[in-house]
Amino acid sequence: QKACTMDYFPVCCQIVLGGGAYTAGNPCSCQGFVASKGTCDNPYPCPCTTEAQFPVCCTTQWGLVSATGNCACGCMGGVPVSDGPCPEVY
């Protein structure tokens, strides 16, 4: 159980399972998706810190990507296609 604070110091938040980080507020860290302190290299803040961070399979311009929530999916310009991580590609 992580301690949750509602301050909004930026953290680098991994919103894509296995990679892809976006700058987000501290509530992100409650969900365990923090890559590092401070802002990410990605210049765009992602307001995806208030929803439950359940994996979704998201269709994006890069193909199917497993994201940590519908908001994270939308943050990449994607559309959720199913709950849970995307199936492995063979």
Curated annotation (Swiss-Prot):
Keywords: Disulfide bond, Hemagglutinin, Lectin, Pyrrolidone carboxylic acid. Disulfide bonds join 46-71. GO terms for molecular function: carbohydrate binding. The N-terminus is blocked. The modification Pyrrolidone carboxylic acid is found at residue 1. It comes from the Eukaryota. Coiled coil: none annotated. The keyword Disulfide bond applies. The keyword Disulfide bond applies. Lectin with specificity for complex N-linked glycans and O-linked glycans. Has hemagglutinating activity towards rabbit erythrocytes that is inhibited by N-acetyl-D-galactosamine. This is Lectin-1.
